[in-house]
Amino acid sequence: MNLNKYETIYILQPNITESENLILINEYKALIKKYGGNNIVVQHKGRRHLNYNIKSYYDGIYVQINYTASSNLVRILEKAMRLSQHVIRYMTIKNCHMNDIKI
């Protein structure tokens, strides 16, 4: 199985409490571990004003998760975020550093 480095950033509704935020983070970390992901690093980016409203919210709580996993896990994680009522937007990118590229 080919493992790649991914970075997922998601935005939570601004009315989420810190305890609800931690519950969501632990759910996503458990999901990543369950499907073979590792090297999980979570960064709280805090509450920020959005440039445009998303689902009638003008602020959001940003959370970033970096991890190593297969592409199948990314689909599973994004589906869980899509079904969550607290996540208003998410995005996953594959980290590809220049020194990893073979010419």
From Swiss-Prot:
Gene3D superfamilies: 3.30.70.60
A Gene Ontology BP annotation from the UniProt entry: translation
GO CC annotation: chloroplast; ribonucleoprotein complex; ribosome
InterPro entries for the chain: Ribosomal_bS6, Ribosomal_bS6_sf, Ribosomal_S6_plastid/chlpt, Transl_elong_EF1B/ribsomal_bS6
Keyword field: Chloroplast, Plastid, Ribonucleoprotein, Ribosomal protein, RNA-binding, rRNA-binding
Localization per Swiss-Prot or TrEMBL: Plastid, Chloroplast
Pfam families assigned: Ribosomal_S6
MF (Gene Ontology): small ribosomal subunit rRNA binding; structural constituent of ribosome
Role according to the record: Binds together with bS18 to 16S ribosomal RNA.
HAMAP family named in the record: Ribosomal_bS6
Family statement: Belongs to the bacterial ribosomal protein bS6 family.
Protein name: Small ribosomal subunit protein bS6c
Lineage, top ranks: Eukaryota, Rhodophyta, Florideophyceae, Rhodymeniophycidae, Gracilariales
GN (gene name): rps6
